[in-house]
Design a protein with these regions (language model features):
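Outer-membrane beta-barrel proteins
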Residues: 10-14, 52-56, 82, 103-106, ...
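Outer-membrane pore/translocation modules
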Residues: 1-66
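Alpha-helical membrane segments in multi-pass integral membrane proteins
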Residues: 42-48, 63-76, 87-99
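Short loop/turn motifs that connect adjacent beta-strands in outer-membrane beta-barrel proteins
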Residues: 38, 78-90, 122, 155-161
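Residues that define the transmembrane beta-barrel architecture of outer-membrane proteins
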Residues: 20-26, 61-69, 88, 107-111, ...
Length: 161
């Protein structure tokens, strides 16, 4: 399970609901992942709700909620022989992503191939490109590059005596 809340001050000018960049609002969802040998499969479904962007009111004529879904597959390319969590991993990934606005039926469907590097099982760098396959909604960025860095803090409050 996951959830996030975001604030944004920009004007609202697209059908797509995206609290990680364009909308204020919240998102809650569930992620299921299965590791099969050197391949990881992951599915996500979430509910996303947009609200006013500070003084920029959400348009009454636009759908304010969305159902998001994704399916991804990642394959460990290197190292060939995995022996330790400290090894650097290189993964090839492909992700299918979509959003549907239940209030008006508009939707999009994208594909996003990427390369991922994982260092010491704690730091992650993803580089990829997202392509729009189908869409019936107005979107600001239907395609584009992705560069992401994540760093996990394992037990940051653990007493280390």
């Amino acid at each position: 399970l996951y959830g996030k809340y975001a604030f944004n001050n920009s004007d609202i000018h697209q059908d797509e609901i995206e609290i990680s960049g364009h909308n204020s609002g919240f998102e809650s969802g569930i992620i299921a992942t299965q590791l099969l040998h050197k391949t990881a499969l992951s599915a996500t479904v979430s509910f996303e709700k947009a609200i006013d962007n500070n003084s920029n009111k959400f348009p009454d004529a636009q759908a304010a909620s969305a159902i998001n879904y994704s399916l991804s597959c990642g394959k460990l390319m290197l190292p060939k022989d995995y022996s330790s969590f400290k090894q650097t991993n290189m993964n090839a990934m492909i992700e299918l992503l979509g959003q549907t606005l239940p209030q008006n039926g508009k939707s999009y469907f994208d594909i996003a191939p990427a390369i991922q590097f994982i260092f010491n099982s704690q730091a992650r760098i993803d580089a990829g490109y997202r392509f729009q396959l189908l869409s019936s909604m107005n979107r600001t960025a239907p395609q584009g590059f992705l560069l992401r860095f994540e760093y996990l803090l394992f037990n940051p409050f653990e007493n280390r005596n």
